[in-house]
Swiss-Prot record:
The active site is at C19. Pathway: tRNA modification. The lineage of its organism: Bacteria, Pseudomonadati, Pseudomonadota, Gammaproteobacteria, Enterobacterales. One of its GO terms (cellular component) is cytoplasm. Pfam families: TusA. Signal peptide: none annotated. It is found in: Cytoplasm. Belongs to the sulfur carrier protein TusA family. The keyword Cytoplasm applies. The keyword tRNA processing applies. This is Sulfur carrier protein TusA. It comes from Edwardsiella ictaluri (strain 93-146).
Length: 82
């Protein structure tokens, strides 16, 4: 079995941060990425289980995977093209 979270282009550690900080950091990080690059987000704020998927939909990025059964939560985002 392949670990989808292995080898992302960038990693963002949002542990200990609370809403809205994790999403603000994701937005800032993604802004400096090239379309198609991947970002691993590691967070422990329960609000990210709603906020990260919503951010991806709104900003037209792809949420490739999420692991939210236990903390730390992990999300793998692929930057959309624009």
């Amino acid at each position: 079995m392949t670990d989808l979270f292995a080898n992302p282009d960038k990693t963002l550690d949002a542990l200990g941060l609370r809403c809205p900080e994790p999403v603000m950091m994701v937005r800032k990080t993604v802004r400096h990425m090239v379309a198609g690059e991947t970002l691993l987000i590691i967070a422990d704020d329960p609000a990210t289980t709603r906020d990260i998927p919503g951010f991806c939909r709104f900003m037209e990025h792809t949420l490739l995977a999420q692991e939210i059964e236990q903390t730390p939560y992990r999300y793998l985002l692929r930057k959309g093209g624009a």
